């Protein structure tokens, strides 16, 4: 009994599910049949069906900018390192105990400033000894000269032999030689005493002290007492591709100093401006580059030895150049081109010859003129002769474009 009772319930459930499925199927079919005639009727009432209906839709939105005429600087760029104009390790030239340091670590010093003192006692004693010996020998020389004068008078009356006269003359000459040696000894002792006062050999900034007061130092110490780096002026050494050498040489022949700018590691902040000093005399065969040195006054201490910077050197300025945003320049099978807008906002493809460019602007040497409007965004939707809707059109007469132009003129571009 229980088995037949369960079977009946299973049959009832299956029948209910089948009924629900049939109802949903019938309802969906009626909806599709009622929608089809309305859609067909709407298509028939439309003035232009199919593709013509699509063409009557909204115009493709694009952004545009106006080509402008301006002076464009040309820069050569490279990576470089700041180096001190001079780097000197200050060492003692005499042996002795370090008595005093007369500088603060990091301060600027001038050539001749006193930096340190070595105990001068032994050098003063040596000087006094040399001076005493000199005085003694000078007295001996004076006495020998007086004797020589008497011998010369006596020789005239044959009271002194010629041999005695010659011997006295030789004694005078010998003593004169001794005097010269004594004078050299005095000068040497004086020099040793002077060297006990250690002075700055060049202008520059002193580093950290390498030895403390009280230590015994030697003239043979390679570490030295302190290192001085000359930072006013300071140099920048950077590299350029060998292909840029001719451009630099030609710019140098113009007779004007070439301006070199130092920018920070991120190339977003200008640190200082200097001038080209020289090119190296050979190309690095491994990298195909040449080293270039520029010099900066660095009075504001914006540059520091061993600092990494981006270098930019102005080599030329292209006057009356036609400039457009780089985003407008496209590349196709026929070469570079831009989409130009006419007065009716219809676009046409113009082949162009680009010149100097960077990430923001590009110089167009042929193909368009100043005042032409070019498409900068929405280019992928364009076809020849299509009419478009210009949205947020950019013009160089706006304050935003003027700011961009000033920034471009300041930074320039690399060819």
From Swiss-Prot:
Main subcellular location of this protein, as a coarse class? membrane
What membrane topology term does the record carry?
Peripheral membrane protein
Q: Which InterPro entries does UniProt cross-reference here?
A: CusB_D23, Multidrug-R_MdtA, RND_pump_MFP
Name a GO molecular-function annotation.
Answer: efflux transmembrane transporter activity
Give the region (Disordered) as residue ranges. 31-60, 392-415
Q: Where is the signal peptide?
A: 1-21
Keywords recorded for this protein, A-Z: Cell inner membrane, Cell membrane, Membrane, Signal, Transport
According to its record, what are the GO cellular component terms?
A: efflux pump complex; plasma membrane
Q: Which domain of life is it from?
A: Bacteria
Gene3D superfamilies linked: 2.40.30.170, 2.40.420.20, 2.40.50.100, Helix hairpin bin
User: Residue ranges under compositional bias (Basic and acidic residues)?
Assistant: 399-415
This entry's comment on induction and repression of expression is:
The mdtABC operon is transcriptionally activated by BaeR.
Indicate, by first and last residue, each region the UniProt record lists as having compositional bias (Polar residues).
31-47
> Which cell locations does it reside in?
Cell inner membrane
Query: Subunit details for this protein?
Result: Part of a tripartite efflux system composed of MdtA, MdtB and MdtC.
Which protein family is it in? Belongs to the membrane fusion protein (MFP) (TC 8.A.1) family.
Q: Which HAMAP family match?
A: MdtA
Physiological role: The MdtABC tripartite complex confers resistance against novobiocin and deoxycholate.
Q: What is this protein called?
A: Multidrug resistance protein MdtA
């Amino acid at each position: 009994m229980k088995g037949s009772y369960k079977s009946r319930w299973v049959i009832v459930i299956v029948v209910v599910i089948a009924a629900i499925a049939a109802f949903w199927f019938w309802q969906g079919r009626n909806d599709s049949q009622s929608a089809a005639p309305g859609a067909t009727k709407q298509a028939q009432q439309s003035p232009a069906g199919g593709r013509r209906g699509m063409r009557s839709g909204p115009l493709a939105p694009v952004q545009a900018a106006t080509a402008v005429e301006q002076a464009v600087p040309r820069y050569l760029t490279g990576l470089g390192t700041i180096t001190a104009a001079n780097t000197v390790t200050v060492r003692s030239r005499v042996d002795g105990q370090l008595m005093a340091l007369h500088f603060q670590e990091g301060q600027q010093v001038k050539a001749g400033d006193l930096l340190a003192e070595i105990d001068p006692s032994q050098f003063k004693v040596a000087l006094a000894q040399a001076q005493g010996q000199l005085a003694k020998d000078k007295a001996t020389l004076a006495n020998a000269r007086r004797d020589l004068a008497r011998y010369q008078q006596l020789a005239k009356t044959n009271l002194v032999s010629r041999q005695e006269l010659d011997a006295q003359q030789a004694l005078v000459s010998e003593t004169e030689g001794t005097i010269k040696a004594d004078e050299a000894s005095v000068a040497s002792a004086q020099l040793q005493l002077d060297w006990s006062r250690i002075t700055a050999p060049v202008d520059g900034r002193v580093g950290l002290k390498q030895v403390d007061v009280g230590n015994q130092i030697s003239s043979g110490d390679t570490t030295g007492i302190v290192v001085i780096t000359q930072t006013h002026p300071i140099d920048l050494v950077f590299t350029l591709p060998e292909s840029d050498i001719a451009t630099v040489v030609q710019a140098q022949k113009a007779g004007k100093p070439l301006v070199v700018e130092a920018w920070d590691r991120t190339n977003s902040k200008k640190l200082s401006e200097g001038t080209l000093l020289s090119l190296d005399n050979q190309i690095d065969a491994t990298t195909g580059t040449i080293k270039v040195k520029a010099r900066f006054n660095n009075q504001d201490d914006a540059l520091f030895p061993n600092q990494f910077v981006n270098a930019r050197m102005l080599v030329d300025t292209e006057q009356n150049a036609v400039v457009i945003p780089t985003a407008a320049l496209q590349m196709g099978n026929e070469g570079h081109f831009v989409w130009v807008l006419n007065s009716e906002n219809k676009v046409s493809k113009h082949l162009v010859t680009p010149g100097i460019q960077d990430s923001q602007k590009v110089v167009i040497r042929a193909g368009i003129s100043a005042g032409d409007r070019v498409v900068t965004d929405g280019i992928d939707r364009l076809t020849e002769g299509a009419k478009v809707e210009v949205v947020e059109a950019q013009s160089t007469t706006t304050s935003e474009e003027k700011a961009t132009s000033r920034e471009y003129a300041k930074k320039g571009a690399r060819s």
